[in-house]
Structure formats: structure tokens, C-alpha cells
From Swiss-Prot:
Phylogenetic classification of the source organism: Bacteria, Pseudomonadati, Thermodesulfobacteriota, Desulfuromonadia, Geobacterales
Function recorded in the entry: Allows the formation of correctly charged Asn-tRNA(Asn) or Gln-tRNA(Gln) through the transamidation of misacylated Asp-tRNA(Asn) or Glu-tRNA(Gln) in organisms which lack either or both of asparaginyl-tRNA or glutaminyl-tRNA synthetases. The reaction takes place in the presence of glutamine and ATP through an activated phospho-Asp-tRNA(Asn) or phospho-Glu-tRNA(Gln).
Quaternary state and interactors: Heterotrimer of A, B and C subunits.
Record Gene3D superfamilies: Glu-tRNAGln amidotransferase C subunit, N-terminal domain
Organism listed in the record: Geobacter metallireducens (strain ATCC 53774 / DSM 7210 / GS-15)
Protein name from the UniProt record: Aspartyl/glutamyl-tRNA(Asn/Gln) amidotransferase subunit C
Length: 95
């Protein structure tokens, strides 16, 4: 499968990228090479291979939830440059 410049332009549009003609030419060649590699992988016989999502067997290791003491409001606000009624005061950033 050959990638066309129009397809590269379409992908660039979806990614909101503005490409120069030289970049379009470069990416056309690079995407062609990638697809050629994928086509080569499709030639492999994988009929006896079990589908996996990880190369090694990995499982999540969860810990039990435990209640622990927190640092407290006063300690949390101790170094705050500005606070009011037990809260951090920050500059307004949204009008």
C-alpha cells in the first residue's frame, strides 16, 4: 500500500499540523516505510501464538487502604504566602 501526499495532508489536517511541501514529501516516504514494515509483519504465521496484551505476565499489585494521620490544616498552610479562613488564597486566573 502506497501512501499518497493527499493522505499525508489529511492526517496533518486531523492533527492540526501545517506542513511545508518538503515536510509532506518527507512524511510520505516515512509513512510508506512504516506501512511496508507492518505489511511485512502481516506475513508472519501467528496461528499458534496466544494473543497477549503484555509481553510478560504482569498484574496490578494493590495495597490495602489504611487510614493514616494527615498533616493537618495548620501545617499544610504554614508556608502559604496568603491564606484566608483555613484555605489557600491564590491569584485570580480566570476572568
Amino acid at each position: 500500500m502506497k501512501i499518497t501526499k493527499a493522505e499525508v495532508d489529511a492526517v496533518a489536517l486531523l492533527a492540526r499540523l501545517e506542513l511545508t511541501p518538503e515536510e509532506t514529501e518527507t512524511f510520505t516516504g516515512q509513512m510508506d516505510a512504516i506501512l511496508a514494515y507492518v505489511e511485512k509483519l502481516n506475513e508472519l504465521d501467528t496461528s499458534g501464538i496466544i494473543p497477549t496484551s503484555h509481553a510478560v505476565p504482569v498484574e496490578n499489585a494493590f495495597r490495602d487502604d489504611a487510614v493514616r494521620p494527615s498533616i493537618g490544616v495548620e501545617n499544610a498552610l504554614a508556608n502559604a504566602p496568603d491564606r484566608v479562613e483555613g484555605f489557600f488564597r491564590v491569584p485570580k486566573v480566570i476572568e
